[in-house]
């Protein structure tokens, strides 16, 4: 993209050249859970068990990212066994639960994976996510994120959290890196 202000047409709508340029360099995608991978609702069973719904299209996008050399990590404020199980199913090995200060987990990931902040994308939905989002190369807010987060993000998804917003981000990263066609036809 040579012209400032130019954009790329995607199946999700136009994406600015600046966002595409940032997405080209991403090697680690960090995701929140509640409000990003799920719709933010927590269902409580009669025996106190916690239930959440996860979108299979998000799962497919995550698997495509992982098989295209983009690491995926979860940093979430809550702790739930079902999140651990979902990560195991998808092949996500970097899971940080119960994080009231997400910067601690973020710093640990950077050190563990030897990745610079500019090579990280973070997808969040609420103000707890902003301290990490302001440090990464590509900050993403889901469409239904907190109103104060949306204008601060580099990119806002067209799709709401829990409704395949993560898939939109994965597709964007793969498209920017010229890997989207390679990801077609994979199975999860």
Where are these regions (language model features)?
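Non-catalytic pre-domain segments flanking phosphatase-related domains
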Residues: 1-31, 179-188
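Asp-based phosphoryl-transfer active-site loop
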Residues: 23-42, 133, 166
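Short coil/turn segments at beta-strand junctions that form active-site/ligand-binding loops
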Residues: 25-27, 70, 118-119
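Short secondary-structure boundary segments
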Residues: 33, 77-78, 99, 143-146
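Substrate-recognition element of Asp-dependent hydrolases with the DxDx(T/V) motif
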Residues: 36, 62-86, 96-97, 133
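Short, basic/glycine-rich phosphate-binding loops at helix/coil junctions
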Residues: 38-44, 83-90
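Basic, amphipathic juxtamembrane/active-site segments
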Residues: 41-64
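Mg2+-dependent phosphoryl-transfer enzymes with acidic/Ser/Thr/Gly-rich catalytic loops
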Residues: 51-55, 88-90, 94-96, 103-188
């Amino acid at each position: 993209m040579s012209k400032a202000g130019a954009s790329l047409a995607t199946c999700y709508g136009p994406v600015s050249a600046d966002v595409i340029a940032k997405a080209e360099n991403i090697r680690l995608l960090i995701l929140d859970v509640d409000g990003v991978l799920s719709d933010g609702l927590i269902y409580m069973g009669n025996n106190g068990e916690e239930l959440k719904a996860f979108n299979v299209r998000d799962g497919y996008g995550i698997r495509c990212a992982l098989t295209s050399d983009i690491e995926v990590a979860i940093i979430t404020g809550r702790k739930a066994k079902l999140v651990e199980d979902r990560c195991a199913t998808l092949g996500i090995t970097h899971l940080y639960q119960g994080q009231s200060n997400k910067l601690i987990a973020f710093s640990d990931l950077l050190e563990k994976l030897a990745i610079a902040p500019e090579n990280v994308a973070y997808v969040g939905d609420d103000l707890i996510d902003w301290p990490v989002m302001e440090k990464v190369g590509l900050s993403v807010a889901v469409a239904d994120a907190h109103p104060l987060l949306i204008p601060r993000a580099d990119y806002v998804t067209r799709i709401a959290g829990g409704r395949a917003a993560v898939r939109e981000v994965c597709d964007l990263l793969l498209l920017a890196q010229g890997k989207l066609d390679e990801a077609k036809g994979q199975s999860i």
